[in-house]
Amino acid sequence: MSKVVYEGWMVRYGRRKIGRSYIHMRYFVLEPRLLAYYKKKPQDYQVPIKTMLIDGNCRVEDRGLKTHHGHMVYVLSVYNKKEKSHRITMAAFNIQEALMWKEKIESVIDQHQESQVPNGQQYVSFEYKSGMDTGRTASSSDHESQFSAAEDEEDSRRSLMRRTTIGNGPPESVLDWTKEFDAELANQNSDNQAFSRKHWRLLQCQNGLRIFEELLEVDYLPRSCSRAMKAVGVVEATCEEIFELLMSMDGTRYEWDCSFQFGSLVEEVDGHTAVLYHRLLLDWFPMIVWPRDLCYVRYWRRNDDGSYVVLFRSREHENCGPQPGCVRAHLESGGYNISPLKPRNGRPRTQVQHLIQIDLKGWGAGYLPAFQQHCLLQMLNSVAGLREWFSQTDERGVHTRIPVMVNMASSSLSLTKSGKSLHKSAFSLDQTNSVNRNSLLMDEDSDDDDEFQIAESEQEPETSKPETDVKRPEEEPAHNIDLSCFSGNLKRNENENARNCWRISDGNNFKVRGKNFGQEKRKIPAGKHLMDLVAVDWFKDSKRIDHVARRKGCAAQVAAEKGLFSMVVNVQVPGSTHYSMVFYFVMKELVPGSLLQRFVDGDDEFRNSRLKLIPLVPKGSWIVRQSVGSTPCLLGKAVDCNYIRGPTYLEIDVDIGSSTVANGVLGLVIGVITSLVVEMAFLVQANTAEEQPERLIGAVRVSHIELSSAIVPNLESE
């Protein structure tokens, strides 16, 4: 193998013949004359899945941002202009990685072009500008492309417009306010230092932001349309990190944008342009003022100086009509300008400008100045939210997601549909993302390709290898086991608002150790469970309840009759009345040599050093959430655990009362247990690279448990 210029995990992106897109992880290797990718990191002389010869005729086409099942990826296409049918399309979950690959590939292409100059075979040099000076034209090189060979002239013009990160340029209806501002900057001189005061005045300083108002009066806008206002602030993060966060409309947005209630993708026009639906949360006398929503086109580009521009303007769309219970506001102009500043004390700094000119419509917008002012300031304060989010967050590798607006794109949507149904769909966002995270994708290049989970591969690409290199029976899906024969006295209910019930938690709600955790200290979403949770019992008695797996007719006994292995976790709650919540996890068989098998058949010392619990409290008072926390805990080190190894099961009796600290937390929890929703994940801690990544034994969510629903079990020995 020749010298490697650059290598690493990237996403393969494309569309199948039926038009459905696909993405999956592949290991890309760039050499001085070759670009290739493999299913996994190549060893020795492994044959790649696909290769492309790199020479001076090759080009890197930036296709911008694409959405697949709510996951946004940044797409590059590498091709030879003499043979356009042969190309490699690659993508990354973050724009930094995509730009790094683009730079590396273009540097290799440039070296080949320079080497051809002495021979008289000169290639056109493509040093692309941002397109700021030429309007809709990407660069002067695009004009030179018109003189290429006749057979590829049309395709060349079409693709060269996409080779920079500006796409086709903003739609004609979208006002590029950043372009006008830059032009004014270029024209200013030392005698006109107050040029900015001609158009903007400082209105106030709030939350560390400077709030400006445009001075220009316009006659063509309605009275209810505000003057343009902008907020300017500094965020300690890179332009790329801020840009990726701005482009997302998932649950993370609630943490920094106080005016955001719900957002969704209506149409993806191209890699730089999309139509979005956005419902605002303005919280101004909601009993008398209806909520506002928007349908707008969003365009973005990256400039040569590393800055980003995101532009908004309202538009009508056939799949995004007016919604019952909402007033459709009109966004005359708006967006973000994200510009890099010099680092300070080793920390990146970025100036963020957020501009809004909006007509809120409705009866109150033109006659209640306080309403207009309140709403504008609330939206502009998102810049302060960005600043605080980055200052308080260590994890920067968040995946941006935009849920596809299924309901609005459907022809079955009726304007007479109640506002309640739309409200319900808006708050099913987390459920939608949960399904998206669990979707499995396959490669069109191989019918027997290995599956992987997006959420894991985004964080740590190599974490998919232990799950894909070896097919384990313990990873078989749940539908291979008939779950209908198992039952417990606590009922299962998938309804979000159900009470006194349980359901299986999404494994991706929990972070576990990824591959090479010892070196990189990186955690990943847990993904699929190793075992199936088939039943939950809720018991009470005057004494502590031990060894429940011996009870005739319990789920562990039913599993044994069917030749299945079960793990029983008995969480014992002390008090004047002793309670036990018992979870029954089932699988077909233990895999010899696996970490789970070594845990089941190991001694108590090994088990105590490895059994781990990850708690979550999605619903509950602040003090309970703080007391319980979400930090993983080695159960055997924190409380007393009694292990009972039966022929076809392992029971773990967890005595919460054996720990003073746990007892204190329990005192808080028991008093408000009916108002709590608690999630618990059980796993075996993986300490070495061979054991990693960690896998959940199982996870459960219990909701609003009633103490009175517990029953006294019959534990008479057979």
Curated annotation (Swiss-Prot):
Gene3D superfamilies named in the record: 3.30.530.20, Pleckstrin-homology domain (PH domain)/Phosphotyrosine-binding domain (PTB)
Biased composition (Basic and acidic residues): 462-479
GO MF assignments: phosphatidylinositol-4-phosphate binding
Biased composition (Acidic residues): 442-461
InterPro entries: EDR2-like, EDR2_C, PH-like_dom_sf, PH_domain, START-like_dom_sf, START_lipid-bd_dom
Region (Disordered) location: 134-174, 437-483
Compartment annotation: Endoplasmic reticulum membrane; Cell membrane; Endosome membrane
Cross-referenced SMART domains: PH, START
Phenotypic consequence of gene deletion: Enhanced disease resistance salicylic acid-(SA-) dependent to the biotrophic powdery mildew pathogen Erysiphe cichoracearum at a late stage of the infection process and characterized by the formation of necrotic lesions. Enhanced ethylene-induced senescence phenotype. In edr2-6, exaggerated chlorosis and necrosis response to attack by pathogens (e.g.
Membrane topology listed for this record: Single-pass membrane protein
Keywords in alphabetical order: Cell membrane, Endoplasmic reticulum, Endosome, Ethylene signaling pathway, Hypersensitive response, Membrane, Plant defense, Transmembrane, Transmembrane helix
Tissues and organs where the protein is expressed, per its UniProt entry: Expressed ubiquitously in all tissues and organs, including leaves, roots, flowers, stems and siliques.
GO biological process: ethylene-activated signaling pathway; negative regulation of leaf senescence; plant-type hypersensitive response; regulation of defense response to fungus; response to ethylene; response to salicylic acid
One matching Pfam family: EDR2_C
Main location: endoplasmic reticulum
GO cellular component, one term: plasma membrane
PANTHER family xref list: ENHANCED DISEASE RESISTANCE-RELATED (PTHR12136), PROTEIN ENHANCED DISEASE RESISTANCE 2 (PTHR12136:SF111)
Biological role stated in the UniProt entry: Negative regulator of the salicylic acid- (SA-) mediated resistance to pathogens, including the biotrophic powdery mildew pathogens Golovinomyces cichoracearum and Blumeria graminis, and the downy mildew pathogen Hyaloperonospora parasitica, probably by limiting the initiation of cell death and the establishment of the hypersensitive response (HR). Prevents ethylene-induced senescence. Binds to phosphatidylinositol-4-phosphate (PtdIns(4)P) in vitro.
Name by which UniProt lists this protein: Protein ENHANCED DISEASE RESISTANCE 2
Organism: Arabidopsis thaliana
Gene: EDR2
